[in-house]
Design a protein with these regions (language model features):
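Extreme N-terminal starter segment of soluble prokaryotic enzymes
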Residues: 1-2
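Residue-level signal for short segments within beta-strands and strand-turn junctions
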Residues: 5-7, 45, 67
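A generic beta-sheet turn/junction motif
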Residues: 7-10, 88
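Short N-terminal binding/cap micro-motifs at the start of the first secondary-structure element
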Residues: 11-14, 38-39
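Generic structural detector for well-ordered beta-strands
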Residues: 16-18
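Glycine-rich beta-strand-centered segment in the early N-terminal region that forms part
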Residues: 20-34, 47-94
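Cytochrome P450 core scaffold surrounding the K-helix E-X-X-R motif
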Residues: 39-45
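Short aromatic-enriched loop/helix-cap "lid" or pocket-rim segments at secondary-structure transitions
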Residues: 42, 94-95
Length: 96
């Protein structure tokens, strides 16, 4: 599969990457649409000091569930269209 990388500030490339292998308790998703948000733009511009490179941007997306545990606690099933809440808030860092 293909992935867009920000290799360094101002440098973007498309690379071949291995298909991820789903582990127990995880879902495998096929990304349908991805958004570009301020942190993605900041990583491209090099304005966020805590980002490492290279990085794959795109934490705001919609996707189709390809694989999921059969009896997961959330009722997620293959074929469902999903999105995620990509935010983990510590309440103490610069971003928070």
């Amino acid at each position: 599969m293909k992935a867009m990388y920000i290799d360094a500030p101002g440098q973007v490339s498309i690379k071949d990457v291995e298909m991820p292998v789903r582990k127990e308790g995880e879902v495998l998703l096929k990304i349908l649409y991805g958004g570009i948000c301020g942190s993605d733009l900041g990583s491209y511009r090099g304005t966020f000091a805590y980002f490492d490179y290279p990085r794959i941007p795109g934490h705001e997306f919609s996707a189709e569930v390809i694989e999921a545990d059969e009896n997961n606690a959330y009722g997620i099933k293959p074929g469902m269209i999903v999105t995620c809440n990509p935010y983990f808030n510590c309440g103490h860092c610069y971003s928070c």
